[in-house]
Amino acid sequence: MRITSTYRTYAQINNNRPAIVTDKEIVPYSEWYDLVQRTAASFYKVTGIYKRVALFLPNGRLFLQLFAGASEAGWASMVGDMRWKEQEIEERLQQITPDLIIADEKMKGYFHQSSTKTIFSDEIEEWLCSSSDFQKNDGNAPFYIGFTSGSTGKPKAFIRSHSSWIESFRCNQIDLEMTEKEHVLIPGSFINSTFLYGALSTLFLGGTIYVLTKFSPARLMDFLHNYPISKVYVVPTIIQGLLNEGYYNEQSVSFISTGAKWLPSVKAKMRLQFPTANFYEFYGSSELSFVTVLKNNEQIQHAASVGRVFQNVEISIRNDKGEEVGLGEEGVLYVKSKMLFDGYLNNEEETKKILQGDWATVYDIAKIDEEGYVYILGRQNDMIIYGGMNIYPQEIEQVLMKYDGVEEAIVLGIKDEYWGEKVAAFIKGNVSLPSLKNYCLRNLSSYKIPRVWRKVANFPHTTGGKISRPEVRKWFEKGGLE
């Protein structure tokens, strides 16, 4: 089975029901099914199945059409960020070695001399097949390639199977209480897998998605006022944007949130401005998928928790010896489910660190109480979640250490009401911080640029000679680095 397998049924029984609504068009299921089939045939025509495509496109129907069409044809799609710098693009393309690149016409200046076959958005209509004849695949092939990072700070490509996401779709139905009648607003970029998943899961279940081509609080509220929205996928930046504008809404809508955990002050403000709304927070990762969910009626009494496990997930919390710990005791969180990723592309060594038999771990430190509520106490990999985007300190640290005069550098995530977390850089060396920031602007995506900069005379170190992240964090929180 494929993530696109249900489209034909909806085209037959709900042919006039909108599948996708944007500020520019409405696409009913009958048209959506036809577009996906013709697009799949176009991919198949290139070189058959089990190939890879890199997509560099803005939010909209065309992106979803190409992603779904590639999935239907047995291809795997890498979702590229149009904000990536040249080096970031090259690193990722070298890893996945795509058979085809499809990019926005605004990127012709970059891709026009690419050795990989490239199609631009203004050429799609000519490329698209008029018929939908192609060999159907069985859904066992990977369909999605994303990027995460490990201790080296270098991006690693991870792969997802159709079956893992289809199993996740069951969580939407059972744990998030979603039906085929949903009207789901997708306000964020498909670069973030939260929003891509939100769109594709809704289409699989037969609902209608409303896609913002570009986010703004005003546009989100316009869609809430003008359409029968029942669910909204959000990350902390979107929530804070709504709060900053002071919007008030009494619609019965549910907000589904991932990313950095909401601060209690943010939750309180949301309940004042959206008094009849429901809130769902879920915890997971690129490798693990869904792990826990904190439902609306649990938000106050268990505010510090990430919730209880989804109905199709098992967890185990273990000490350094691999032994399961007792209730309330800290340990490394292990997860068992059918939603786990397939592994890292061409990186068996790193895959084995995550996938361990039937279990998997990203080395988050957790504990569980007697009622089954899970608490995440820290991340062994120190990942920062900035506005729903995953940022890995090691990647930024590597850039900082290449700058002349930098002797030592460390990057941390610090709590922020708007972003959830923001990036802070601590530098030892005879350098100009404005010059160092300009250097980062030339070598990192804009969202990875540190928002807080501090120079340090000396760092605290561990016995192994590494900078002690916990001690630096304590210094900062006590105002010792101001």
Enumerate the predicted regions with their spans.
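Conserved AMP-binding/adenylation subdomain of ANL enzymes
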Residues: I166-H183, I191-K231
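Conserved AMP-binding/adenylate-forming
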Residues: E25, S42-R83, G188-S189, N390
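Conserved AMP-binding/adenylate-forming core of the ANL superfamily
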Residues: N16-T47, A54, P58-G60, K85-E90, ...
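Conserved ATP/PPi-binding loop(s) of AMP-dependent carboxylate-activating enzymes
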Residues: R308-N312, E323-I354, M389-I391
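AMP-binding/adenylate-forming catalytic core of the ANL superfamily
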Residues: I101, S337, D342-G343, I365-K448, ...
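Conserved pre-ATP/AMP-binding loop-to-beta segment of ANL
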Residues: S130-F147, K154, E177-H183
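Gly/Ser/Thr-rich phosphate-binding loop
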Residues: S230-K231, L243-Q301
